[in-house]
Every structure is written in structure tokens, then in C-alpha cells.
Regions:
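Exposed, interaction-prone extracellular/peripheral surfaces
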Residues: 1-173
Length: 173
């Protein structure tokens, strides 16, 4: 059975798990038409999902995880405690992972519209340290709830990243 829930502050679309012919195609269609939102709030969508999930299974959460790690833990851990096999697919753009700026640049937050000017010194040192610390915090959060964390660079084909992860899972047993 396969299903999907697309959410931002609230549930945008929910297709319950089903094993009928065409279910996977419906999930792909839902993901394909999903639009970026002005932020994400985990509490309501995750409680909505937990109320509706009937059987144990694999739950993949796909996000940039620009959220507080405690909020992530508080809202995803109940799924793991229900016996769900949780995977956090952490999507980041190459420019988020390794920014390369030569002069002061104005960056605009696509979710809030807030703009900030940043210097090359900040981006090449402090930002790099902060993003690595955040990725590490998400990894530790996943580990703390016995979930997998998979960092995906959006410049890589998704099928390659998924294949690598599935190969890792198969070897792990």
C-alpha cells in the first residue's frame, strides 16, 4: 500500500495508503502538483496523519527541515513509537550546502520574503559551520528516534539518491 500527505501549515492533500491499481500513480501525481509554501508547521499535519494511519509501515518525511529540531522530534517521534519505520529525506540545494559568493549578496527567504545582506566572509565560514551543525542536529534527532536520515543534494537525480539509500537499507538488513 502507498499513500501520501502534502502539508505546509496544514494538510494540503492526503491520499490514504491503498494497494489498488493506480495508487502509486496517484501518489506521483500528488507529489508532482505540490507547490512550495510560505513555511511549514509540523504539529497539526503530523497529528492528522497519526490519527489516520491504520497499520505499521514505512513513513518518509521529505523536507528541507528548516525547523527547530525539538519540534521535529516532538512531532515525528510518535510515528516511530507507533512502530512506523521513519525516514527523514533531507533535501538541500547545492547553494545551501556550499554557497560560493565573492561579494556581499542580498538573500531573500522564499517562505517569509524576509531579505538579508550577507558577506562572503559570513557565508564561507560561519554559514558553513551553521548548516553543518544543523544537518548534524537533524541526523542526531533521527538517530534518537531510531529513524534514518538521508541528506539529498537536489542537484543529484532523485532515483540515484533513493537507490543509494535502498542499497544501504538492504545491506543493513
Amino acid at each position: 500500500a502507498v499513500g501520501v500527505m502534502v502539508f505546509a501549515d496544514n494538510v494540503v492533500e492526503y491520499r490514504p495508503p491503498a494497494s489498488r491499481s493506480g495508487s502509486l500513480q496517484g501518489v506521483i501525481h500528488t507529489l508532482d502538483k505540490a507547490q512550495p509554501a510560505k513555511g511549514t508547521e509540523l504539529k497539526h499535519p503530523m497529528s492528522h496523519f497519526q490519527e489516520r494511519i491504520k497499520r505499521r509501515g514505512l513513513v518518509a518525511v521529505i523536507s528541507d527541515f528548516y525547523c527547530d529540531t525539538q519540534e521535529l522530534l516532538d512531532n515525528i517521534r510518535p510515528l516511530a513509537m507507533q512502530g512506523q519505520d521513519v525516514i527523514l529525506f533531507h533535501l538541500l540545494d547545492p547553494a545551501e550546502l556550499n554557497p560560493n559568493i565573492k561579494e556581499s549578496t542580498l538573500y531573500e527567504d522564499l517562505e517569509t520574503g524576509h531579505a538579508i545582506e550577507v558577506s562572503p566572509v559570513f557565508m564561507n565560514k560561519e554559514y558553513h559551520d551553521r548548516i553543518r551543525a544543523h544537518i548534524s542536529a537533524i541526523q542526531n534527532t533521527a538517530s534518537g528516534m531510531n529513524a534514518d536520515h538521508v541528506l539529498i543534494n537536489t542537484s543529484e537525480p532523485l532515483d540515484k539518491a533513493l537507490h543509494s539509500y535502498l542499497t544501504f537499507r538492504e545491506k543493513r538488513g
